[in-house]
Amino acid sequence: MSDIALTVSILALVAVVGLFIGNVKFRGIGLGIGGVLFGGIIVGHFVSQAGMTLSSDMLHVIQEFGLILFVYTIGIQVGPGFFASLRVSGLRLNLFAVLIVIIGGLVTAILHKLFDIPLPVVLGIFSGAVTNTPALGAGQQILRDLGTPMEMVDQMGMSYAMAYPFGICGILFTMWMLRVIFRVNVETEAQQHESSRTNGGALIRTINIRVENPNLHDLAIKDVPILNGDKIICSRLKREETLKVPSPDTIIQLGDLLHLVGQPADLHNAQLVIGQEVDTSLSTKGTDLRVERVVVTNENVLGKRIRDLHFKERYDVVISRLNRAGVELVASGDISLQFGDILNLVGRPSAIDAVANVLGNAQQKLQQVQMLPVFIGIGLGVLLGSIPVFVPGFPAALKLGLAGGPLIMALILGRIGSIGKLYWFMPPSANLALRELGIVLFLSVVGLKSGGDFVNTLVNGEGLSWIGYGALITAVPLITVGILARMLAKMNYLTMCGMLAGSMTDPPALAFANNLHPTSGAAALSYATVYPLVMFLRIITPQLLAVLFWSIG
């Protein structure tokens, strides 16, 4: 058997063994995709014992390409919500998550200096302790750029594997410990979170208002500033028993009922100007109007603003709201449409059908993957990651590398959505498949390279001390920030658990947090809020630590 055939066969065996290990769960908790790393270590141990020779060049290419696939698909997935997560609504959560990253870096630096841990080993421990695989890839690349011998670079994968299990268990222990310390009632926390969401300013809500202001009588909607702006959509108007879709030229009369969509603060301002909220239903049932959700798939409307499509004027149809990557938005006229946007349309059936034809509404297109944008994005990401940034006094130029470059480029392209007929939307199933393939390839190679010396290091070497160092890097930041968030910021417990899981980019921890109260979305929401920024910082941190440690000796 040729070296290439043998290498591919061994990698397939590693994937099978590793995925099996990852699927084994104890009380609902398992290693997940991290099992592939240990599958690689097991197979790598026996490969080393048998004296087999694998193609090192091929392993290196597979490892790097797997990492690129993984981080690129993550960026495409979270890109649409990344910049929104940095705004005020998620600022507090992101600050606490960043604090966890900073404290983890400080603990790593202290351990490195106190115990004189070799640089590749301490970076591997750091990456494993925070259960972040792209950090491992970024650290290995910067070490190679600094001229570290390959046998030392491979030690990083071994120390990563030592620290990884407690990285997963440590965050679960922290959640449990904080629950005990603060005597948390999970049901109460879930109710408080739901109440805050209802009263908060981030959700899109609807209300029905009666026109009671005599100054508005006989005015057109376009002449009422609060109704003609971008913060509120008036999607229905009821006069006596007639329900209609209002256009900008529709005349308002006293006693009219308006169905408004917007954020709570803006709707409150509308009440002050127009009139009081009423309980009267403005449902389309029993009328010639209907409400329908339509998905944007027509390439000809991508990038166009809603106001430029003139749906109100041409079809008497109102877009009441827009869902983009799971986030509900007010469908203001200045929003540019992206592939996969889901629009709520209100109008007559024939008019809605006409608008749906303009927008595309081809569900099958959502399952198709445009491969050209994928490779354009990967290519641009690799180029971005290869740009050196020279910092005075540093022995090597800083680079985003093959982990950071594709991630940043994917975040940008995911936010842009489309350029001409090229769109970077990727069906969730396709995104997940590419992401899992990438991480399996990467971890398989890392495990194989570490497996030869793993058992000897654990039994006869410094493996146990590495595990202890990793436990400190995991536990100290999580416990410190968890206590601060609860005591000083009075953060909701479920929200805090999601933030802690997101700060470690740890899906098993998110699964545990979600199971604390299965019907509450608090943990998932905070996890998604901090995940993009933390993923970026986790990739950059080992590079900064490597250069700093290297420069100060």
UniProtKB/Swiss-Prot annotation:
Keywords: Cell membrane, Membrane, Repeat, Transmembrane, Transmembrane helix, Transport. Its main location: membrane. It is a multi-pass membrane protein. One of its GO terms (molecular function) is monoatomic cation transmembrane transporter activity. Residues 191-276, 279-361 form the RCK C-terminal domain. It holds the Pfam family Asp-Al_Ex. The chain crosses the membrane at residues 4-24, 28-48, 65-85, 95-115, 158-178, 371-391, 393-413, 439-459, 464-484, 493-513, 533-553. GO terms for biological process: potassium ion transport. It comes from the Bacteria. It is found in: Cell membrane. GO terms for cellular component: plasma membrane. InterPro entries: AAE_transporter (IPR050144), RCK_C (IPR006037), RCK_C_sf (IPR036721), Transpt_YidE_put (IPR023018), YidE_YbjL (IPR006512). Belongs to the AAE transporter (TC 2.A.81) family. YidE subfamily. This is Putative transport protein YidE. It comes from Escherichia coli O9:H4 (strain HS). The gene is yidE.
